[in-house]
Design a protein with these regions (language model features):
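Conserved ABC ATPase "signature" region
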Residues: 32, 47-66
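Conserved catalytic motifs of ABC-family nucleotide-binding domains
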Residues: 90
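ABC ATPase nucleotide-binding domains
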Residues: 171-249, 269-270, 276-279, 297-309
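Conserved ABC ATPase signature
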Residues: 43-44, 69-73, 77
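Helical segment within the ABC ATPase nucleotide-binding domain
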Residues: 109-122
Length: 309
């Protein structure tokens, strides 16, 4: 049989993107409407109802908004109060439409943490629509992408949020999605690369991003395939020279790097932790420093120290 309105309100709460505009209602009044499915005909709050309202407002860090007129608040503050209203409704299912809209990063993280804890600790089923793929991967147990108004697929974040799947889902012909960082990357610069970056341990990433912003195509290497630099370089670099992790660099890989750097007029290198397995990094770097036809630029903490011409 169908639920009555009161019964349905005890089962499901909804937080929509559209903003309500109630006149002369305070933040507390808005949150308290979440308790009306539990009140009598006159809508009078019991002590238990008041406690639930106050707990919900504390949970979303909105107690200081209780006495202020709802229409006078910012969009982010309104969003927190509407979430508090849904929380004190004590539903079995919570549906949220773009709940992170209008929120700065601090409250966005707090909101997602609250939703995650509600699902885990209270057994509430949380259904939310998001355009932020990175957040969907971090918070969701299941991801259901929608395309052209239809469910495109359904599965775990690991199954759905893959590079090629996202490319097909959004019909992307430029740029790429990185499932490791959960980030969207702009297209790599076009043209013949005359710049090379020698780095390791994630220290080349700031250089990659600056070169991309300046529209300078570049070669990255030698990079171990399990290095953070490698993960981003495969999206941004024109060419990546890679080596297998936890092994000495093979002669063929080293010669490929020598050949690549010989055609570059500018070489960036970063702080690299030296060890026995990557000693050929240093060998390659020393060869570059000995050249007079190339500029070798050291990168550390944003500082540049130039060598050569």
């Amino acid at each position: 049989s169908a639920f009555s309105g009161r019964e349905l309100a005890r089962k499901m709460a909804v937080v929509l993107t559209d903003r309500v505009k109630p006149e002369l209602m305070t933040g507390y009044d808005i949150v308290a409407t979440g308790r009306y499915p539990y009140t009598g005909r006159l809508g009078i709050l019991s002590r238990e109802d008041i406690r639930k309202v106050e707990e919900a407002m504390s949970l979303v860090d909105a107690k200081d908004l209780g006495s202020r007129l709802f229409v006078s608040l910012s969009d982010g503050q309104k969003q927190r109060l509407l979430l508090a209203r849904a929380i004190c409704q004590e539903p079995e299912i919570l549906v949220l439409d773009e709940p992170t809209s209008f929120l700065d990063i601090k409250y966005k993280l707090e909101l997602l943490d609250i939703l995650r804890r509600m699902a885990k600790e209270q057994g509430i089923t949380v259904i939310l629509s998001l355009h932020e793929i990175d957040l969907a991967g971090k918070i969701s147990d299941k991801v259901m992408p929608v395309k052209a108004g239809r469910v495109y697929d359904c599965g775990s974040p690991e199954e759905i949020l893959r590079e090629e799947f996202i490319r097909r889902l959004y019909d992307m012909d430029k740029g790429s999605f990185d499932p490791v960082f959960g980030s969207i990357e702009l297209p790599r610069p076009a043209g013949k690369p005359e710049t090379m970056v020698i780095s390791a341990c994630g220290r080349g990433i700031p250089v990659y991003r600056r070169l991309q912003k300046e529209g300078i195509p570049f070669i990255a290497g030698i990079l171990y395939r399990n290095d953070m630099d490698y993960q981003l370089a495969r999206h941004l670099a024109s060419r990546v020279i890679a080596a297998e992790p936890f092994q000495d660099i093979e002669d063929s890989v080293y010669e490929e790097a020598r050949e690549a750097v010989s055609g570059c007029s500018r070489v960036y290198y970063t702080d690299i932790p030296w060890g026995s397995s990557n000693r050929r990094f240093r060998q390659l770097l020393e060869e570059v420093k000995g050249r007079r036809d190339a500029r070798c630029i050291y990168e550390a903490s944003g500082d540049r120290i130039g060598y050569g011409t």
